[in-house]
Amino acid sequence: MRIKRFEFNMFPVNCYILSDETKEAVIIDAGCFYEEEKQALKKYIDDNGLNVKHLLNTHLHLDHIFGNPFLLKEYGLKAEANQADEFWLNQADAQARMFGFQLPEPPVPLGKYVCDGDVITFGNTKLEAIHVPGHSPGSIVYYCKEENCLFSGDVLFQGSIGLSLIHISEPTRPY
């Protein structure tokens, strides 16, 4: 599996494009906010001849969904995330205002729900979805057993507990 990492937006967010030898791919957390970030993502996809099969979100906090409208327009990709986070989409404008900016485009509805235990396939690669509520009610991590690789969004941070941007985050709530 080939992994390309981008660091996007003002918060910042790690966005990943995973692909394999078949040229099929998935995008995880398309947090591209600025036009140059969107174009960098597009350039990588197009230059590598990738056929993106899934647009996955680890959760639906504002900073992780900025690029979803762009990818829907550009490639017809509908975002996939856990249903427990869907309410964040209706609060995106209020979240943006809370941080002093306006969304360039409204969020787009989810195309599919991702549940604990779902297997996402692209090419010859499989990712297992694992529901890990805490940072947000619908937090999902994506695990590739064959590569022993985990894409955790904001659930794990190196050397810290990260930043809970939204007051509804409940890092110590027992689930």
Residue ranges and their predicted role:
Residues 30-32, 60, 83-84, 134-136, ...:
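Active-site metal-binding loops of divalent metal-dependent hydrolases
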Residues 18, 29, 59, 71, ...:
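Divalent metal-coordination and catalytic microenvironments
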Residues 1-48, 141-153:
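Conserved beta-strand hairpin/beta-sheet module of binuclear metal-dependent hydrolase folds
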Residues 6-8, 103, 109-111, 131-133:
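Short Gly/Pro-enriched turn/cap motifs at secondary-structure boundaries
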Residues 33-38, 42-122:
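Active-site HxH/HxHxD metal-binding segment of metal-dependent hydrolases
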Residues 166-175:
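Single conserved hydrophobic/aromatic residue that forms the stacking wall/gate
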Residues 88-92, 159-165:
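A short acidic, helix-capping loop that chelates divalent metal ions and anchors anionic groups
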